[in-house]
Amino acid sequence: MDSNPDGKLILVVDDEFDVLSAYTMLFEFRGFRVRTAANGAEALAAAQRERPDIVVSDYMMPVMNGADLCVAWRADPALAAIPFILTSAGILPRDLLPPYDLFFRKPVSFDTLLAAIHQLIARPD
């Protein structure tokens, strides 16, 4: 599972430019196409322009955080079935139960994240 011959599209959402740059480079090296957004509102707009195969989003961001993005994502019939991975360097509030598929605490190893992505995009719709 080291490559992605189908060129699946990953939407990476994070307000830290270095994170976006690193993930873009690593995912593209593995054969994925990558789009990025700096907050949840930008991510929703990007997904309207080009529907991704999966989204990897940070939790703590300005404008619209990752939890609010996930709720809006699931409420949109065109996006609801797309797998959603939420990440955070902080601790999520105990009552935060948005309908994300997986959660990883940062820092998460790229190999762990990549394996989860392959698992989620390979599952039947």
What are these regions (language model features)?
Residues 1-9, 111-125:
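Non-catalytic signal-transmission and effector/linker regions of two-component phosphorelay proteins
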Residues 14, 58:
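Active-site residues of response regulator receiver
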Residues 17-35:
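Two-component/phosphorelay signaling modules centered on CheY-like receiver
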Residues 38-42, 65-69:
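Acidic catalytic/metal-coordinating carboxylates
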Residues 50-56:
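Active-site beta3 strand of CheY-like receiver
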Residues 61:
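Receiver (REC) domain active-site loop signature in two-component systems and cognate sites
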Residues 87-88:
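Hydrophobic/aromatic residues positioned on beta-strands within the core alpha/beta folds
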Residues 106:
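A Lys-centered signature of the CheY-like receiver
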